[in-house]
């Protein structure tokens, strides 16, 4: 044993176990090759060429079926590439009469439409519950909710911005019902 072999043995880099695994791989390769009948006197290249020729003739003898071309009826459209249609730019005015009307407000926001909520003549407790629900819906949809006047609010879906201070605009026009 040479000096290098002793060092490799100490570091466990030259283990006899590795040799056993190498030998097992050698036998595994032989078992796979024995599955195919072969002539030991033939060269590998000729054997491979013959096997590919046999496989191609097997493919040729089977009846060929034409692949059926199917097209998907669903076309994915990303929101950023979608062009806004006039119906998407619609502003809906809803005058709720009970808390159940909040579902209509949320569905309208889900459809990407702006909602003006007119709660004039509604009980203050019911109006507060509707505003709380609408505020949660707008927040969940990354939208916005702003007060226009005492009992009129505007809720917008994601992608629709409200610019300016609507309350100050309403005060400047001195419209009835716009003051606190």
Curated annotation (Swiss-Prot):
Listed InterPro entries: Cell_div_SepF, Cell_div_SepF/SepF-rel, SepF-like_sf
Bias kind Basic and acidic residues: ranges: 57-68
Low complexity bias: start-end ranges: 69-79
Annotated Acidic residues bias: 15-35
Region (Disordered): 14-81
Subcellular location: Cytoplasm
Keyword tags: Cell cycle, Cell division, Cytoplasm, Septation
Domain of life: Bacteria
Pfam annotation, one family: SepF
BP GO terms, sorted: division septum assembly; FtsZ-dependent cytokinesis
Main location class: cytoplasm
GO cellular component: cytoplasm
Function (record text): Cell division protein that is part of the divisome complex and is recruited early to the Z-ring. Probably stimulates Z-ring formation, perhaps through the cross-linking of FtsZ protofilaments. Its function overlaps with FtsA.
Subunit record text: Homodimer. Interacts with FtsZ.
PANTHER family assigned: CELL DIVISION PROTEIN SEPF (PTHR35798:SF1)
HAMAP family registered for this protein in UniProt: SepF (MF_01197)
The family this protein is said to belong to: Belongs to the SepF family.
Name the record gives this protein: Cell division protein SepF
